[in-house]
Amino acid sequence: MSSIKKLGTSSLAVLLVAETALACAGEGELEPEREGVPDASAEVADAGDAGDGADAADAADADPCSASGLCIVPVPIDTRVNVTSVSGSGAKDVWAVGTARTTLHYDGAVWEKADTIPYDAAPFTMRAVWVGGPNDVWVADGPTIHHSTGWKGPSATVWESSVLAGTYTAPTAISGNDGRVIIGRQISNQFDDYEAAIVTCSGWDAGGLLEPTYLENRHFRTNGTDGLWSIAMTGPNEAWGTSFPTTNGPGARVVRAHLASPGDGGEPDAGPSWQVEEYDSRTERNLYGVWGDEQAVWLVGEGGVIRRMTPANLPSGVFENVPSPVIADLRGIFGFGADDVWAVGDDATVLHWDGKVWSRLASPFDSAADKPRLFSVWGSAPNDVWIGGNGVILHFEGKAP
């Protein structure tokens, strides 16, 4: 079994809407989407992202910056837009996506909102963005993957689009490493017709995935909604993902996909092949985010759950329970090394791991009556960390505790 390798991306928060086919409201009818336990059909539009407005950020009731160095930054969006995912290639190339098909870009000075990606479909929520480089941008949008060769401005940025194979499926998380891209999908199994929850490819080419492989689906065979909530690569040949809740249980399943040689689980005489194995998360709570490096793979989720897998524990297949300082749901995680990992979640929760203990950072919303949910965290460096949430983007430029 291969060792845990360095991860090249953050986990990506995935937040889906109700299973009934909802009619899409106009883009002016913005309400924060209810981002709780997923119960979804892959082909459901935003429906105006209707939900509980209490979770939206109220900057008027918040401080510009907290004592910890977290600051609210100006972003050209309605405060009811949920920023669901953040990724970038560097300090001057940061992307964020969210509800109402919102796409944002930061060039090192200001955030700009892109024109809506031209696509003949209802305005789905942008579930995930992954940036492999300045000229390699991937976005999950309902049942569709969009790809751009880089930011050229709000109106001039060029996109190509592709719908992946399968019926009632939707990409929910994207990750990549060293030329390899892996996509986690929500699937809807009908009458024992099982779709692939994991798709891997060698990049983007001529309007679609280059050399796509749809991985065997042994672990995702619940009739109805199943598949992956988050996914993160730990090397070009390895990724970890967390599952959706199903009628059979909560979203507490964890799988590892890796390219195995014939002597390590692959088919004899067939050369290396992708294998998918399930691991014990030691929780029955929903798991919303995953991140890892050569030292550990981290999981975060419902009720402040934090789990860790180290190379020493990999043969056992069992994750370690790590004490959490909060009971709020944690929805995103990203890190830079063994002593510098970030996690974010409900009630404006921002946590940091210093190699020994998780601690909560002061937030600009600590004194606010309504505290936003935070969904995604990504950084170009330890002193350049971005966080997206309910109507807000936070930036950290200091030194974490």
Model-derived features with residue positions:
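Residue-level hotspots at or immediately adjacent to binding/recognition sites across diverse folds
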Residues: 26-29, 36, 43-45, 52-401
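Bacterial N-terminal signal peptides that target proteins for export
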Residues: 1-14
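C-terminal motif of bacterial Sec signal peptides marking the signal peptidase cleavage site
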Residues: 20-23
